[in-house]
Amino acid sequence: MKWDTGRMARIIEAAQGKRVVDLCIRRCRLVNVLSGSIDTVDLAIHEGFVAGWGSYRAAREIDADGMYVCPGFIDGHIHIESTLLAPAQFCAAAVPQGTAAVVADPHEIANVLGLSGIRYFLEASEGLPLDFFFNLPSCVPATPLETSGAALRAPDLDALLPHERLIGLAEMMNFPGVLSGFPDVIDKLLLFQARRIDGHAPQLGDLGLNAYVAAGITSDHECTTLEEAREKLAKGMTVMIREGGQSRDLAALLPAVDEHTWPRCCFVSDDVHPDGLLREGHMNVIVNRAMSLGMAPVRALSLAALTPARHFRLDRRGALAPGYHADFSMSPTLNPWQPERVFKAGVEVARDGRLLLDLGNGNGVAAPPSPMHITRLLAEDLVVPAQPGLLRIIGVREGTLLTRKIVLPPKIHEGAAVADLDRDILKLAVYNRYVPDRPPAVAFVQGLGLKEGAIATTVAHDSHNLIVAGASDADILHVVDAVRKSGGGMAAGRTGAEVDVLALPIAGLMSDQPVERVAERLEQLQGRARAAGSGLRNPFMALSFLALPVIPELKLTDLGLIDVSTFSPVSLFETS
C-alpha cells in the first residue's frame, strides 16, 4: 500500500480528528512496543494506516472491551518451502496466527528452478493478505560440493533488484568463500552493500567472525550457544533467535537478550512444517515460549514485530503508531498471546483461527515444471564394498541441524558394508534428480531409528536432490521409485507393501493443497516412520538436512560424504 499526495493529505486530516476515520478500536489495551507501555486507548485507523489514538469519530467501531492489541508479527527469516505450502496456502495458515509479514529466503526453490522459481514466488505472493518480502539467495548452489538445478551469479541477482519486495541478500552460507575472498562471493557482497546481508555462520568466532562481519554481513540465525550469540552481538550483528521445526535455540539464547542487546535480537522460524504450523502456530508460539521462559511480554512481542522491521528497514511496520501500517492482532490475554482477531491494513482478515477470505489457489499463477530425471535405479549402485578401517557414520541429533561424526566398525555381509539395525545404522543415499543416469552417493546414518523399510524426500537442503534412508537396499529402491513416479515429494514404505506418498508438484518442494490436507498426509508419513521404529519428533525434517554440507559435522550430497569442518569430501572408511 503506497502513499501519494491525496492519501497523505487525508491521513494528516484524519490524525487531527478533522476527518471521520474508517475504523476505531474502542477501549483496547495497546501494546506499545516503542515505549514499552500498555495503555487503554481508542485506536483510529484510516485507509490502512494508524491515524493515532485519542478522541475520534469513526465510520465503524469495534468495542475491544479491554482486549490487547499488538502489531502484526514479522518473521525475519523463513523458507516458505519448508512449510510444504504454496504462498497462498502458507498465508491462509499463518495470518490467523497474527503474522503480518515475512522476510523469506527462496533459495530452496531457486536451487531447483533458478530465477524462474524466484519469479514464481514473487508472482504467486502478490496481492495476498500477508506481505512477502524476499532476500535473494546468495548460494545457489549452496556449495560446489553438490549438484543443484541452477546456478545464480551476481549478474543474475542484479537483474531482479528493481523489484520492490526484494530487499536484501539472503544467508551467506559459504562463509569459507567469504574468508577466502572467492570472486563470486565478493561480487554478491558488493552488490548488496547498501542493503541488508543475512549471515549463516554456525560456530564461527574470533578472527574468522571479524572478517565475516567486516564483509558487511549483518545478522546470523545459526547461533546455538549463549557464548556464540554474545560474541556476534558484541561484533555488531543482529542475532535472529531461531525456534523452528527442527532447530530450537530459544531457551539457550534467551539470556543474551538484555537492556543493551534487545534492539538487535529478533525471533525467526527458519524452517517449520505444516503440522507444526497448524497445531502450534507460527510467530505467536515463539512469543509464548519466550514469555514462558521468563521474558517480559512487551519485549517478547517487540522481538516478533519491531526489531525485525527495524533490522530490515521496513518503514512504518513493526509497531502501532501514527502513520504505521494498521496490521495487528487482538488477544484476550497478554500472556499467552492468543490472536482471536487479526487485521491487515485495517481490515479484519481472520477470526478465531480461521481466515475470513477465500484465497482458493491464490492468484492463479502456475509453477514451472518440476525436474525429476532419476533414470537409474540399480541395486549394484547401493553396494558398499568392504574396505580396511572403521566406517564414518553421520550421527543424527534430536532438536538440532548439527550432526556428529561417528566412527564404528562396519557390519559386513558378503563382502559389503550393510545397515546394522541392532546399532541403529541405516544406509543413506542421495540421487541426483537434475542429470539423468547418475548413480547415487551412498553412506550410513545413525539415529533415525528405523527397524524396517525406508523413508525418502526430494526436500533435501539445499540442492533438493532425492535423499533416502533405509533398512535394506530393496526398501530403498522401492521407495525411491515411488517418489520418482510422483514427480517429487515424500514417501515411506517397505518392500512388498504400498508406499505412502505426499506428492509435492511445485519444484518437488511444495503442495498446492490446503495446510490441513498437507498436514494430514504428512502425519500419515510420520506415523509410518514411527511405526517402523523412528523415535524422532520429525524424522522427515531430520532427513531433509542430512544433505546440507554447510552445517557441521558430516553430511552426504550427490557427490559423496562431506566433512563440513574441512569443506571437503572424505571416504566412507577411516584408516588412520
UniProtKB/Swiss-Prot annotation:
Catalytic activity: adenine + H2O + H(+) = hypoxanthine + NH4(+)
Gene3D superfamilies: Metal-dependent hydrolases, Urease, subunit C, domain 1
Alphabetical UniProt keywords: Hydrolase, Manganese
Entry's EC annotation: 3.5.4.2
This protein's record includes keyword Manganese: yes
Pfam family membership, one: Amidohydro_1
Cofactors demanded by this protein: Mn(2+)
InterPro entries in the record: Adenine_deam (IPR006679), Adenine_deam_C (IPR026912), Amidohydro-rel (IPR006680), Metal-dep_hydrolase_composite (IPR011059), Metal_Hydrolase (IPR032466)
Any GO molecular function: adenine deaminase activity
GO biological process terms held by the UniProt record: adenine catabolic process
Family listed: Belongs to the metallo-dependent hydrolases superfamily. Adenine deaminase family.
NCBIfam families attached to this UniProt entry: ade
Record-given protein name: Adenine deaminase
Gene: ade
